[in-house]
């Protein structure tokens, strides 16, 4: 099976594991996925992630509250292989009035919507996470 949208696959795996309250989820490795996971960890949406180089996979540790509530309430892939969505710095969207984040692929790497505004760069809107 040929996978055309690796990011959508990773987000779907995270969403499904999160809904089932799994502690970890495994995804195939790629540089873009690692960059996205760094942002998710920095923003507090995941606990951690580990790269297993010899198996070419990433193990993502999901994060829950003390009451076993999900930290990630929702994920939505915005840019798709058939329809790329780009934004300028003036039109960067706010997710749930600032409660969530937009992942934006810029020439300075993968940034959140807030960091992209601070850096004054636009780019491809990859996903919304709240």
UniProtKB/Swiss-Prot annotation:
The keyword Acyltransferase does not apply. InterPro entries: Ribosomal_uS8, Ribosomal_uS8_CS, Ribosomal_uS8_sf. GO terms for molecular function: rRNA binding; structural constituent of ribosome. It holds the Pfam family Ribosomal_S8. GO terms for biological process: translation. It comes from the Bacteria. Coiled coil: none annotated. The keyword Oxidoreductase does not apply. One of its GO terms (cellular component) is ribosome. One of the primary rRNA binding proteins, it binds directly to 16S rRNA central domain where it helps coordinate assembly of the platform of the 30S subunit. Part of the 30S ribosomal subunit. Contacts proteins S5 and S12. This is Small ribosomal subunit protein uS8. The lineage of its organism: Bacteria, Bacillati, Mycoplasmatota, Mollicutes, Acholeplasmatales.
């Amino acid at each position: 099976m040929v996978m055309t949208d690796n990011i959508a696959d990773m987000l779907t795996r995270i969403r499904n594991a999160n809904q089932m309250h799994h502690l970890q989820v495994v995804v195939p490795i790629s540089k873009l996925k690692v960059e996205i996971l760094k942002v998710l960890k920095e923003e507090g949406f995941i606990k951690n992630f580990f790269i297993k180089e010899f198996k070419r996979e990433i193990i993502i540790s999901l994060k829950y509250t003390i009451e076993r509530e999900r930290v990630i309430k929702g994920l939505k892939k915005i840019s798709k292989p058939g329809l790329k969505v780009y934004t300028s710095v003036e039109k960067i969207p706010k997710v749930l009035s600032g409660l969530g984040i937009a992942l934006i692929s810029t020439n300075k790497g993968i940034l959140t919507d807030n960091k992209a505004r601070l850096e004054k760069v636009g780019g491809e809107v990859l996903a919304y996470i709240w």
